[in-house]
Amino acid sequence: MKPSGFPNAERKSRPAVFLAALTLSATVGAATEAAGDSNTYGHHRWYVSATVGAGGDGSAATPFNTLAQVQQASGSGDIIIVVPSPVSVPPLDGGIALKSGQRLVGGGPAVVKFGAPLVTGGPPVVGASGLPSLPRITNTTAASNSGDAVTLADDTDVENLVITRPHRGAIYGQDAVGVTVRGNDLSGFNTSGTVGFVVQPFDLATFTPGVGIEVATGVRAGWAAILIDTANVSTSVSVSNNYVHDGVCGDGIDIRGMNIGDIGVLVTYNFITKLVQCQSVSAIQGISTQVTGASRLRATLFGNTQADNGSPGANMDRLFVNPAEAGTLIETIDHNVDITGIGGASTNGFEYILSNGNANSHVTISNSYFRNNPGDMLEEFNYGAGSRTTLVLDNVTVEQTTISGGVPSYATPPGSATITGNLGECLAISADGANDTTVLQMADSSFTGCDNNGIQVTSNHAADNGVGNIHTVIVNIDNSTINGSRFYNLWVNNLTPLTNLRVRVQDSDLSVSSSGVPVAFDQPTGTTVSAVIDLGRGTLGSDGRNCIFGGAIYDLEATQYNVTAENNWWGSARGPLPGKVVESVAGYNIDTSKSLRRAPPACNGEEPSR
């Protein structure tokens, strides 16, 4: 059984960005200040200050006093330094559009600093330095740059700035090649309530056979503090060490690929906290990635923390992944901490929704911790047609969902739930498009305190979502804990024709359901051409050694599926208790032979492998 708390990640190496993250915030401000007017690269160095009068020439001795002046005077490759001013002085207003190769840098000491992690063993958390004088800018109207404080260009850097209360975003880039955003303090963004990221249209999965609910206009989220759009170029993006907090109506960090854009992005050691949803949008998101058209996106997220995000009734998704159309999205999330989502039932720690089309995607989450959420903590939804989603969970801890939306009428016990998401699952997985392939690979992970189900997997082809059947559903669970859920710890159910189902579970604790059945496989209205469910000694190679007992009704139940479940622990040396393992339809079989005589390591026992 895996312990609670942040996962032990000693076996995982940290990338080189770790040391860079810890040292950058202490050096970037001081280094730019000490450089003075020297010009190593042959470019000009310009200064702008909120505390000087008019008539300056942009030098260190007589800075400009508006962003418009320094934007006009500076050229490609120049360095622009924002001079710190007392926090009682209004920030420089009007925003600035950078030229290629420019660096926009806040002078003076670092405006952010690293503090202790929120969870023991987690990544350090970046926050405000609390200095009396800061390099502050904003853009309070849409009169210039659409209300963004900074507009990026090719090969630009934005470092060590405090950006507060811009009309739209703090930093925006469109088809900007090779950009870096690091060590900034961003707050109060999107005072206008402008829509930014739009979750692409999708067919919402339900528990009614053949029925989906069309969400034709998608879901509108607020314009992000940092938004990078790429449609026609190939670019690399780095977003690191930023303190993104107290948003008015905006997402945190959004990366979007469109058309034929090609993006590689590194998002590291950012702290996102206290984002709220306003009335003009339907969602708010912490860190989001998206592909549409034929765009491609490769994202690496490392060492980020999200905490206390959302507002009453909000649709708050702290990590959001949205492939659509013919896009390709590959994402790795490592050493992430997410604590306390605030909002309604559609609030998630991580939502992975392939909205439509034949997009291809793969997301890996490793060495990460999620706690306290009023909706599904994790979601994998494959709503395309001919599309593929793969979710890999490696050393991931999920604790405490705080709502119970129940189960559908055909579940055990019967309930009244109608849609497959937003029920309070630790992980909800749904597929409803023709020819879809949906994969879960889970290892060395722990789900506890799931107030509805631990893992719910539903296959239900919506009749209006492509021609043909859902193609493949794969669930592979190894050395993990999913126990003590209100209803199911693991429930795989199919409502319409499915071509392939593969389920393999070994060395895992699936014990105890306070109100239902720990493990179940059901197709009350569906059929599966080829189904293999291997909980022990089956054809998929599971060694068993699972803990399956403690259900309020049954311990293991199946409807129209054969299940191999040898070499498992049923809470007793005598094997399953009478009436606790049930196949609901004659002609199918659950094989529980050769049961273990002692508890295996999965539930703190010492039964050796046979």
What are these regions (language model features)?
Residues 68, 76-118, 166-167:
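N-terminal extracellular ligand-recognition/capping segment immediately after the signal peptide
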Residues 75, 93, 99-100, 132, ...:
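Parallel beta-helix/beta-solenoid
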Residues 103-166, 185, 190-193, 200-209, ...:
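Right-handed parallel beta-helix/beta-spiral solenoid domain characteristic of secreted/periplasmic
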Residues 31-41, 559-610:
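Extracellular/surface-exposed low-complexity segments
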Residues 30-69, 84-86, 599, 609-610:
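Right-handed parallel beta-helix/beta-solenoid
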Residues 161, 184, 242, 270, ...:
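Consensus "Asn ladder" position of solenoid repeat domains
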Residues 95, 147-149, 169-171, 192, ...:
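Structural detector of coil-to-beta-strand junctions
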Residues 111, 144, 165, 188, ...:
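Residues in short coils/turns that link rungs of repeat/solenoid architectures in beta-rich domains
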